């Protein structure tokens, strides 16, 4: 119940404030970023438990119906399977006929029989534009050892219409994963995500996963020895710190160690981080 009291400046209304008082309603893009961050954290903290096999997806090329925008598009693919999210490199100036030839190794959780594929146009000064998407059902014949090489239709409502956005060529194979098999770890980065009702908030101290077509970590049934990480030299650390003064020293060290001392790969990962900040 609301009440009114008098102060030196006049009457003041006192009552229960609505739950959305002084809160910013997140956009669809912000909600998508939040969902991606949650999915990545699920993968990092046990999302790959109970995996039963490994699916190899080769994203070969696409034939799109239209080039959106004034310049040639820079398309890339995003694949979501279970809690894991994978991305191909960007096909710069790929326009309507991008080629990736990117092999993505995915762990398949129990009960998962399909994955969601999206094609984005990478933008330099705005949010990436989603131009096509489709659900792909994992063929049953893969579990019997066959290899599937097919073109899949892309649907995009609101522009060209359903199943009119073009085709994408995927090559898929499947392999059973023995118990205790250890897959390569993903790159661990510090996330900055949109939180509902708060706005753009960096979350410190909680690692998430960035998958650029990389292999997620399979949780082994029996204890296994973690792979030896390459030492991070102070010279490389200082050089990268000079290149990325806005990033924390420990974050840079973590990226270098995750890339096993590969300086060029670490620079690419750090560039991706700065683009998202």
From Swiss-Prot:
Look up keyword tRNA-binding and say if it applies. no
Any idea which GO molecular function terms this record carries?
ubiquitin binding; ubiquitin conjugating enzyme binding
**CDD domains hit by this protein:** C2_Tollip, CUE_TOLIP
Which GO BP terms apply? autophagy; inflammatory response; innate immune response; phosphorylation; ubiquitin-dependent protein catabolic process
Per the annotation, the residue ranges of the short sequence motif AIM2 are: 151-154
Q: Keywords, A to Z?
A: Autophagy, Cytoplasm, Immunity, Inflammatory response, Innate immunity, Repeat
Compartmental location: Cytoplasm
Motif (AIM1) spans which residues? 133-136
Residues in domain CUE? 232-275
The family database entries (Pfam families) matched by this protein are listed as: C2, CUE
Q: Does the keyword Transmembrane apply?
A: no
| Tissue spec. comment | Ubiquitous.
This protein's major location comes to cytoplasm
Q: Which GO terms describe its cellular component?
A: cytoplasm
PROSITE patterns in UniProt = C2, CUE
Give every C2 domain span: 35-152
Describe its partners and assembly state: Interacts with ATG8 family proteins (via AIM motifs), and ubiquitin (via CUE domain).
What's its job?
Component of the signaling pathway of IL-1 and Toll-like receptors. Inhibits cell activation by microbial products. Connects the ubiquitin pathway to autophagy by functioning as a ubiquitin-ATG8 family adapter and thus mediating autophagic clearance of ubiquitin conjugates. The TOLLIP-dependent selective autophagy pathway plays an important role in clearance of cytotoxic polyQ proteins aggregates.
What does the sequence similarity comment in the record state about its family? Belongs to the tollip family.
The domain-related comment in the record is:
Both ATG8-interaction motifs (AIM1 and AIM2) are required for the association with ATG8 family proteins.
Spell out the protein name for this chain.
Answer: Toll-interacting protein A
The encoding gene? tollipa
């Amino acid at each position: 119940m609301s009440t009114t009291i008098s102060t030196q400046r006049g009457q003041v209304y006192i009552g229960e404030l609505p739950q959305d008082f002084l809160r910013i309603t997140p956009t669809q893009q912000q909600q998508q970023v939040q969902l991606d961050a949650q999915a990545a954290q699920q993968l990092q903290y046990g999302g790959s438990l109970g995996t039963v096999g490994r699916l190899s997806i080769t994203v070969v090329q696409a034939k799109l119906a239209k080039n959106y925008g004034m310049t040639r598009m820079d398309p890339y693919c995003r694949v979501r399977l279970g809690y894991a999210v994978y991305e191909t490199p960007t096909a710069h100036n790929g326009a309507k006929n991008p080629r990736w030839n990117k092999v993505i190794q995915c762990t398949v959780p129990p009960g998962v029989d399909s994955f969601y594929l999206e094609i984005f146009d990478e933008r330099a000064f705005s949010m990436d534009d989603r131009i096509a998407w489709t659900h792909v059902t994992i063929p049953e014949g893969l579990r019997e050892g066959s290899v599937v090489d097919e073109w899949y239709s892309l649907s995009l409502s609101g522009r060209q219409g359903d199943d009119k956005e073009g085709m994408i060529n995927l090559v898929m194979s499947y392999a059973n994963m023995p118990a205790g098999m250890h897959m390569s770890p993903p790159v661990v980065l510090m996330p900055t995500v949109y939180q509902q009702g708060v706005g753009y908030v960096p979350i410190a101290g909680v690692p998430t996963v960035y998958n650029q077509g990389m292999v997620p970590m399979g949780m082994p049934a029996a204890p296994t020895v973690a792979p030896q990480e390459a030492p991070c030299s102070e010279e490389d650390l200082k050089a990268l710190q000079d290149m990325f003064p806005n990033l924390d020293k420990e974050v840079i060290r973590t990226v270098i160690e995750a890339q096993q001392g590969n300086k060029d790969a670490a620079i690419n990962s750090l560039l991706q981080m700065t683009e998202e900040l």
